[in-house]
Swiss-Prot record:
Residues 25-369 are extracellular. SMART domains: MANEC. Coiled coil: none annotated. GO terms for cellular component: membrane. It is a single-pass type I membrane protein. The chain crosses the membrane at residues 370-392. This is MANSC domain-containing protein 1. Residues 393-414 are cytoplasmic.
């Protein structure tokens, strides 16, 4: 009985002695780095501090001592320790240090040494802080991409408003986010606003189209002669004589395209009014476009060869509105295009006729230049021949006869 009580007391004493060490070891998170040691020479200049080495039996005891030590260099807590497994009994093998940052304590390889870093008390480096900021930014982006936290998106009428973060919460999150994340958020907001503007513009265009659809049936019952003749009179008044270019054939294609494009909205209007034929409303639109294109080409196309052309195609449009307006308008347009093509062919043939004349004039000038050059060369050769002959005669020695000598002797005697 006494032996049991003594053993129980010893066990309680051992448990009470080991409890603080185990709790200290559990509270300290460590990172083990084997076979490395601190470069003391370069670390001293960066602020590393340490205590005197002590002897401990195991590495766990050294970790516990580092966790409980908070008086390095006065008030610094231990956050880095080195345990030397090569030391024998009674020799100091546990080294406790305070390191300001990871960069301040560079490591170098060393066999038999184990280095431990306390993660709990170790200061955060720039890499860790940037990683933390990145995770915060990703959280902001994820929160911003949710429909409740999107400030630039407006819900249409009749739909429930999304619930989520308030405006103040979003503004506070934006203020804490990094600069590049703010730019990314702004880009998302603008991309969300663009579909809204497009839908708004489409909604504005729809009432205007409806208004035009309501206005067009009112003008359909009126006689088409008044609508078609008015722009034609204006054109004939402003174009006397009308000036057209060789490039008018291009406008004929645009007339056909405009005819095809203007036909579709008018047919939709006439579908609502079954009593009104679609051809009567189609004719003034086409003639109006043709008149506009004629005036536009006359005023803008001011370059090139201008020729006069009488105005045609007005009489066919003033016929009876009950019979084939679309066919008469198409025939007038085809007549115009045919006349324009004839004009283009005539202008092209005139330009082709002028081409040989210009080539003939060029060849005449060429031969004239060659003849002038040959005459100059000929005169140069003649001049050189005469000059050479004079030089030869001057250098050639004359042969004197007896009479010449006699005369010279007489003159000498005199």
């Amino acid at each position: 009985m006494l032996f049991r009580g003594t053993s129980l007391a010893y066990s309680l004493l051992v448990i009470s002695f080991l409890t603080p060490r185990s709790s200290a070891g559990q509270n300290c998170l460590t990172k083990s780095l084997e076979d490395v040691v601190i470069d003391i020479q370069s670390s001293l200049s960066k602020g590393i501090r340490g205590n005197e080495p002590i002897h401990l039996a195991t590495q766990e005891d050294c970790i516990g001592a580092c966790c409980s030590t908070k008086d390095i260099a006065g008030d610094k807590a231990c956050n880095l320790m080195i345990f030397d497994t090569r030391k024998t009994d009674r020799q100091p093998n546990c080294y406790l240090f305070f390191c300001p940052s990871e960069d301040a304590c560079p490591l170098k390889p060393a066999k038999g040494l184990v280095t431990y870093r306390l993660i709990r008390d170790f200061p955060l480096t720039s890499a860790n802080s940037s990683l933390q900021q990145l995770t915060q930014g990703e959280f902001l982006l994820l929160d911003h991409s949710s429909p409740g936290a999107t400030p630039g998106f407006r819900t249409p009428a009749g739909y429930p408003k999304p619930t989520g973060l308030s405006w103040s919460d979003r503004s506070s999150l934006k203020s804490t986010a990094p600069l590049h994340l703010r730019k990314h958020i702004k880009a998302d907001e603008t991309s969300m606003q663009l579909p809204e503007e497009k839908s708004h513009s489409q909604s504005l265009q729809l009432p205007s189209e409806l208004k035009m659809a309501h206005l067009l049936p009112k003008t359909v019952p009126t006689p088409p002669t008044t609508v078609a003749v008015a722009p034609l009179r204006n054109v004939s008044a402003t174009l006397k004589p009308e000036l057209l270019l060789t490039s008018i054939s291009v406008t004929a294609k645009t007339l056909k395209q405009k005819e095809a494009t203007t036909a579709s909205p008018v047919t939709t209007v006439t579908s609502k009014l079954p009593g009104v034929p679609g051809s009567t409303s189609f004719t003034p639109v086409v003639t109006h476009q043709a008149a506009l294109t004629n005036t536009f080409q006359a005023h803008t196309d001011s370059k090139g060869i201008l020729e006069t052309m009488p105005f045609q195609g007005g009489s066919t449009l003033t016929s009876d509105p009950r019979h084939g307006k679309s066919s008469t308008s198409e025939s007038s347009i085809t007549n115009k295009t045919a006349s324009w093509e004839d004009r283009r062919v005539s202008v092209g043939s005139a330009s082709l006729n002028k081409g040989p004349k210009s080539q003939h004039g060029l060849s005449f000038e060429k031969w004239l230049l060659i003849g002038t050059l040959l005459c100059g060369v000929l005169f140069l050769v003649i001049g050189l021949v005469l000059l050479g002959r004079m030089l030869v005669e001057a250098l050639r020695r004359k042969r004197y006869s007896r009479l010449d000598y006699l005369i010279n002797g007489i003159y000498v005697d005199i």
